[in-house]
Amino acid sequence: MNPKVPMTLEGAQQLKEELKRRKTTDRKRIIAAIEEARAHGDLSENAEYHAAKEQQSFNEGRIAKLEGMLASAEVIDTSRLNSSRIVFGAKVTVIDEDTEEESTYHIVGDEEADLEKGKISISSPMARGMIGKEAGDSIEVRAPGGTRHFEVVEITF
């Protein structure tokens, strides 16, 4: 049995939408491309056919991966959380104690992480350093670039 992997409700919904799109729209489009390429004759030297088959393989692989992720997901509705401590699903505002730069991070599951959107994985060094802390606490994060220090400013859900 696969261990359960934490995932936000939003993250699970995004994966379900991608899965639905890949099973319906993308699959149909790829099948049509394969059929069209087959109509061109000799498949051994048909680049369009091979490209479409490669797309099909990638799409089916991604479908299998999405189904696996959703099957092992422990979906957590973060809107129902309320804690003074940092836990999975929290949105945490911190100040870098060296640069005085303020940043906000949303602690999410591994598959949802997107640093550009401020979403960090629960298994990242930053999130691991935050878990259990409260507003006003200092965080020490050991990362490949060295140790950094932050102060927790605000925790929201």
UniProtKB/Swiss-Prot annotation:
Keywords: Coiled coil, DNA-binding, Transcription, Transcription regulation. PROSITE patterns: GREAB_1 (PS00829), GREAB_2 (PS00830). One of its GO terms (molecular function) is RNA polymerase binding. It comes from the Bacteria. It holds the Pfam family GreA_GreB_N. The keyword Mitochondrion does not apply. Necessary for efficient RNA polymerase transcription elongation past template-encoded arresting sites. The arresting sites in DNA have the property of trapping a certain fraction of elongating RNA polymerases that pass through, resulting in locked ternary complexes. Cleavage of the nascent transcript by cleavage factors such as GreA or GreB allows the resumption of elongation from the new 3'terminus. GreA releases sequences of 2 to 3 nucleotides. HAMAP family: GreA_GreB. This is Transcription elongation factor GreA. It comes from Magnetococcus marinus (strain ATCC BAA-1437 / JCM 17883 / MC-1).
